[in-house]
């Protein structure tokens, strides 16, 4: 993997920093594991905008990634590593001994030809998935389930990982990258190692158009709007003089947004500042 800084041959190239991975497959993805993906433009079934700043962008196919890792005790060989436009991490196409192919998240250090396995008896090495009751304390894991059999939900983006710091009864305690410590059922499955492509955070798009290719539209400041459009709008010149809020009047600085009291008991320590 290489970090490439583009030459300033134009204003749009001047600040571009690319992450180039020569190991990635250059051909087409594996067709049976593709699904169609339609653009919504951030609108719901009524045609109303429910998520701002979404629209346009390159057409994409969704890759059916195996987050459950429920093909147990059958070894698989990594056929190739691929780019996935739907996530920051790369994915790996693996071929199981029974002939089935699946996509999985590509962990750090996984290469073409490596063997992976899921199940209670799987060895502790990158890419193998097993219940957390069978994983030693102190191990770094990713693609962690919150409910047994539901599929991984925690630590799935590029460079992400979670550390198992304790095991007590039916629960294990995890330390997340945010600093939060939470309990999860020990029966939940996790994959050993951290997600690959950690250099993703070093890339620089360099121009607004690169964001438009990704389907991201501009964000207009509230103070640049009219009073009818935003609480910050209007006034002669740059008037503000109030606490910053969202377009719907909700405070933006420091207001707590979590409303899931049912699972509060599983959080041992809140994330750090």
Curated annotation (Swiss-Prot):
Which InterPro entries does the protein's record reference? NA-bd_OB-fold (IPR012340), Rib_uL2_dom2 (IPR014722), Ribosomal_uL2 (IPR002171), Ribosomal_uL2_bac/org-type (IPR005880), Ribosomal_uL2_C (IPR022669), Ribosomal_uL2_CS (IPR022671), Ribosomal_uL2_dom3 (IPR014726), Ribosomal_uL2_RNA-bd_dom (IPR022666)
Could you tell me what this protein does? One of the primary rRNA binding proteins. Required for association of the 30S and 50S subunits to form the 70S ribosome, for tRNA binding and peptide bond formation. It has been suggested to have peptidyltransferase activity; this is somewhat controversial. Makes several contacts with the 16S rRNA in the 70S ribosome.
The organism that produces this protein has a lineage beginning with:
Bacteria, Pseudomonadati, Pseudomonadota, Gammaproteobacteria, Pasteurellales
Please note every region of biased composition (Basic residues).
Answer: 253-273
Q: Write the record's keywords in alphabetical order, separated by commas.
A: Ribonucleoprotein, Ribosomal protein, RNA-binding, rRNA-binding
GO biological processes: cytoplasmic translation
**Annotated Gene Ontology cellular component terms:** large ribosomal subunit
What family is it from? Belongs to the universal ribosomal protein uL2 family.
Q: Subunit comment for this entry? A: Part of the 50S ribosomal subunit. Forms a bridge to the 30S subunit in the 70S ribosome.
Q: What protein am I looking at?
A: Large ribosomal subunit protein uL2
SUPFAM superfamilies the record matches? Nucleic acid-binding proteins, Translation proteins SH3-like domain
């Amino acid at each position: 993997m290489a970090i490439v800084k583009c030459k300033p041959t134009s204003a749009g190239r001047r600040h571009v920093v690319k992450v180039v991975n020569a190991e990635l497959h250059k051909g087409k993805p594996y067709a049976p594991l593709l699904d169609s993906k339609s653009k919504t433009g951030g609108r719901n079934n009524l045609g109303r905008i429910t998520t701002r700043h979404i629209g346009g962008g390159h057409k994409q196919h969704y890759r059916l990634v195996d987050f459950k890792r429920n093909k147990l005790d059958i070894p698989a060989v990594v056929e190739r590593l691929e780019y996935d436009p739907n996530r920051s991490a790369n994915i790996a196409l693996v071929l199981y001994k029974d002939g089935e192919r699946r996509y999985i998240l590509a962990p750090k250090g996984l290469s073409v030809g490596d063997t992976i396995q899921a199940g209670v008896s799987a060895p502790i090495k990158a890419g193998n998935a097993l219940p957390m009751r069978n994983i030693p304390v102190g191990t770094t894991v990713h693609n962690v389930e919150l409910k047994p059999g539901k599929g991984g939900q925690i630590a799935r983006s590029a460079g992400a990982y979670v550390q198992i710091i304790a095991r007590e009864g039916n629960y294990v305690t995890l330390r997340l990258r945010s600093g939060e410590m939470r309990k999860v059922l020990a029966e939940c499955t996790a994959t050993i190692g951290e997600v690959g492509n950690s250099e993703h955070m070093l890339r620089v798009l360099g121009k607004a158009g690169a964001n438009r290719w990704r389907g991201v539209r501009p964000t207009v400041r509230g103070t640049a709007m009219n009073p009818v459009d935003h609480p910050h709008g209007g006034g002669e010149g740059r008037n503000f003089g109030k606490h910053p809020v969202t377009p719907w009047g909700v405070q933006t600085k420091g207001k707590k947004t979590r409303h899931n009291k049912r699972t509060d008991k599983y959080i041992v320590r809140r994330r750090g500042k």
